[in-house]
């Protein structure tokens, strides 16, 4: 969710820092840029994606360091910019318990439950021309429905 007023971004609820394997921006730099841009509320929602099929991007953050950084910067920016402690947990088949444990492992303000893979296929790089589209759509929406029932 992004909130804007007078064409100025005031709130961003989905951001990733260097704690996510697909980003290299240190949390300190991202927060400084957000603050200098006039952001009032920012949720840091780095990836945790257990079972992700690409070994180059395991998406398993260093949780103690992540939690320490969130706590430090929330205090540092107190009264100037609200920093919400968040997590984007990928939910793959067979990984529900790991996702639940991560979500419950810290006092998060905001959790995004997402899935970047279906049937162990990476959605953003998958070649959809090689599959039956109707079967894939049915699998996709069945999985979305199943996710709504697990109550992370």
What are the language-model segments listed below?
Residues 122-136:
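Surface-exposed cleft-lining segments at the edges of enzyme active sites
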Residues 51-53, 119-123:
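Short acidic/His/Gly/Ser-rich catalytic and metal-binding motifs that mark active-site loops
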Residues 150-152:
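Conserved small/polar residues in nucleotide/adenosyl-binding loops
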Residues 135-143:
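Active-site glycine-rich loop that binds ribose-phosphate moieties when present
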Residues 94-103:
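Distinct, well-ordered alpha-helical segments
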Residues 1-93:
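An N-terminally biased module of ancient metal coordination in phosphate/nucleic-acid-related enzymes
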Residues 42-45, 108-118:
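Non-cysteine beta-strand/loop elements that form the S-adenosyl-L-methionine
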């Amino acid at each position: 969710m992004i909130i804007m007023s007078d064409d100025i971004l005031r709130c961003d609820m989905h951001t990733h820092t260097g704690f996510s394997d697909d980003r290299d921006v240190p949390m300190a730099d991202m927060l400084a840029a957000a603050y200098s841009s006039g952001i009032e509320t920012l949720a840091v929602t780095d990836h945790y994606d257990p079972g992700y099929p690409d070994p180059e991007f395991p998406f398993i953050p260093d949780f103690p360091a992540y939690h320490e950084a969130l706590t430090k910067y929330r205090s540092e920016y107190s009264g100037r910019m609200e920093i919400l402690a968040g997590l984007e947990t990928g939910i793959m088949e067979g990984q529900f318990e790991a996702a639940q444990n991560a979500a419950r492992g810290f006092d998060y303000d905001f959790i995004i439950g997402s899935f970047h893979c279906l049937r162990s296929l990476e959605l953003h790089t998958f070649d959809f021309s090689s599959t039956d589209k109707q079967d894939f759509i049915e699998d996709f929406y069945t999985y979305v429905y199943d996710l709504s029932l697990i109550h992370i």
